[in-house]
Regions:
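A structural signal for short loop-to-beta-strand junctions that line the ligand-binding cleft
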Residues: 69, 77, 102, 107-142, ...
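Glycine-centered hinge/linker elements that transmit conformational signals in sensory
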Residues: 163, 203-233
């Protein structure tokens, strides 16, 4: 019996040792699977015998699954988290579900602006991984075949849409089944149509959501739907990726993260990019950029030592180079070597030179409490507007009613507080 117990104990100890070398990572990004296979390979080559188990979840379900799992004492060692300020990551910090990293991870290769996106209460809560740039991506071959060039104004873009539609080509492929993409469209158009100065005034409470400029933007978007594909309310990003990759639509409102998928589906596609054009020639276009997210150490990690080794590696230019060559995303870490892809160079330049300093979607102060302009107003509201259930003015009223419940500058403007 003693011999059996000893053997069993050895097996338990061996299993514990083996499992302790595994780092489980949860994410909303399915496209990152190969990244972690390469990270594991590189770490092993460095003498660190760490196995990485990567799991990706549906993006719209991810945050709730992560929070509930961590609250229940289960879940990953490393979790993808959203940027700060933002209610979802703030909730993780306030519930002590993730650990600060400032004293254990070297942030010397991150700019202050990027580092600020993971900072709360004077601590860093994650290692940033990507900078995303949004705008209009187009099929260069379709444009060339039809004698089209990148528009400088919204009116020129409408002329392009008319030409394409007259030739039986869908000008835009929209993904209204996924409401978040409609908020993204609204926001990337807003930085060029409204302009950062107007958005700054909104953030200061000098204008509000019933301002005619805000309603005008929503009217432009509502009028644009005649240039979307038939049945666009039932299409999602998977449909869009296939349709755009194989030339079934000329343009998409999207982010640079889509490029990897389009090239995988159709290596021959030639993709161009332009910022959403302003509605008159005297104004400048702007790019909507944001720090996508970060890698965090969870408080329930069963293997924090190896998880930290993984996180330390993700803070290096070597990881940034690996990451961008697989995902075609712009790495958050400085010093990474970008792939020689003209589109990525152009998008990176747009993000560096034309980023709007004021925004109202991801990374904005309008999303840090409930009801959020992103999740609770524009996501369902844009769907309702596109379906004809509400008007642009009624959508503006919904924003006004929601944000005036907690957004202090707006509350002051409306006389709700002093």
């Amino acid at each position: 019996v003693k011999k059996f117990v000893l053997v069993a104990l050895c097996f338990v100890m061996l299993f514990s040792f083996l499992s302790a070398k595994t780092v489980e990572i949860w994410s909303w990004r399915t496209q990152d699977e190969q990244v972690w296979k390469n990270v594991e390979k590189n770490l092993k080559a460095m003498g660190k015998d760490i196995t990485i188990n990567f799991r990706a979840f549906i993006p719209t379900e991810y945050d709730a699954k992560l929070f509930l799992a961590l609250q229940g004492g289960t879940g990953p060692d490393v979790a993808y988290i959203r940027r700060l300020p933002g209610g979802r990551t703030q909730a993780l910090v306030e519930a002590n579900l993730i650990k600060p990293l400032g004293k254990t991870v070297d942030y010397k290769d991150f700019s202050l602006g990027v580092k600020n996106n993971v900072t709360m209460n004077g601590e860093q809560w994650g290692v940033p991984f990507a900078i995303q740039v949004c705008g209009i991506f187009y099929n260069m071959d379709i444009f060339k075949e039809n004698g089209l060039t990148e528009p400088k104004t919204w009116g020129e873009m409408l002329e392009i849409c008319k030409i394409l539609k007259s030739k039986g080509i869908d000008p835009f492929f929209m993904t209204a089944k996924e409401a978040w993409t409609l908020t993204m469209q609204h926001a990337m158009c807003g930085v060029s149509i409204l302009g950062p100065a107007w958005i700054k005034r909104l953030s200061e409470g000098k204008v509000d959501f019933l301002d005619q400029d805000w309603i005008y933007l929503q009217t432009l978007l509502n009028d644009l739907k005649v240039y979307y594909q038939d049945g666009f309310m039932g299409n999602d990003t998977n449909d869009m990726n296939s349709a755009f990759a194989f030339g079934q639509a000329a343009m998409v409102f999207y982010g640079v993260w889509g490029y990897q998928t389009w090239k995988e589906l159709n290596p021959d596609i030639n993709v161009g990019y332009f910022m959403v054009p302003p509605d008159w020639e005297g104004s400048s276009p702007y790019a909507y950029i944001y720090m996508d997210g970060a890698f965090a150490l969870t408080s329930i990690s069963k293997n924090p030592t190896d998880a930290l080794e993984v996180l330390k590696y993700t803070a290096t230019p070597e990881f940034g180079t690996l990451f961008t060559n697989i995902t075609a995303n712009i790495p958050a870490v400085d010093g990474a070597t970008m792939p020689d892809v003209p589109l990525l160079i152009e998008v990176t330049e747009a993000g560096a030179k034309n980023a709007s300093p004021y925004v109202y979607w991801v990374g904005s102060q309008f999303t840090v409490q409930k009801p959020s302009l992103y999740d609770d107003v524009l996501s369902p509201g844009m769907q309702a507007m596109y379906m004809g259930q509400i008007t642009p003015t009624e959508l503006a009223q919904k924003a006004q009613d929601a944000l005036s419940q907690w957004f202090v500058p707006l509350m002051k403007k409306l006389g709700k507080i002093k």
